[in-house]
Amino acid sequence: MEASPRSLTSCTLGPLDQKFSWEQLSELEAYFKVEPYPDLQDRKIMATRLKLKEEQVEAWFIQRSLEEEMRPPLARLQQSALDGTSSPSHKALCCRPPSWKYRLIPINPPESSTSCLKDSKTVLISKTELTDEQFQKLRKHFETDRCPNEETLQAFAEELKLRKDLIRSWFITQRHRMRGYRRLFMRYYRDWKTSREYSTTRSFDRQKNSKECSQNDPGLPEALEALKRLKLSSGYQSRDGMSQDF
């Protein structure tokens, strides 16, 4: 029996007031281990199967990626070792839906002194929450500096009249989206290079380039004509007794 959206067996994803049952979280978590950055089609399939909106699925994967990035390297190695050597009963225990504390994200994260800001305790902020002027200024800075320091964030907060934690969250989210887009592009590029259409296009391009090189070489027609005259003058005959013509 499915848990109701407001039952105690569901939990909230950050400040978005989105509810997920334990069954939904289990499927999302299992898929995340296989593909942390699903494309739009995969997200729609998951949303249909889990009776969620595609935007909810996308938001969950973004925040789950932030959480995974902030895990210490040692913890990741220990988890990998457990996945490979644990008993079936222990693996089943570890595969239970994650605790609420990993799904709940406070609104006011602590300050960070690192130059490249990576904080899992962040607040999602979308383009719709920014004015056009605010969004354009942030995007322009992101093109040259994707990891602004604290001084830059404070300057943006004063200039744009926004909370610094919101600006920090915007940069973190953009970095994760860029990483996801790069993975999607590389996967598409690999599929394209192994496709029959790519092979046909490459063959056509080689033939076209060869023909253009022949047409663009001013000495080639004269050389062929001279070779023809030389063979005719030397009495070169083809197999049928006629002069070989080019």
From Swiss-Prot:
Residues 22-72, 129-182 bind DNA. InterPro entries: Engrailed_Homeobox_TFs, HD, Homeodomain-like_sf. It is found in: Nucleus. A motif (Nuclear localization signal) lies at residues 163-177. GO terms for molecular function: DNA binding; DNA-binding transcription factor activity, RNA polymerase II-specific. It comes from the Eukaryota. The keyword Transcription regulation applies. Belongs to the paired homeobox family. Transcription factor that acts as a regulator of embryonic stem cell differentiation during the preimplantation stages of embryonic development. PANTHER family: CYTOPLASMIC POLYADENYLATED HOMEOBOX-LIKE PROTEIN (PTHR24341:SF1), HOMEOBOX PROTEIN ENGRAILED (PTHR24341). This is Homeobox protein Crxos. The gene is Crxos.
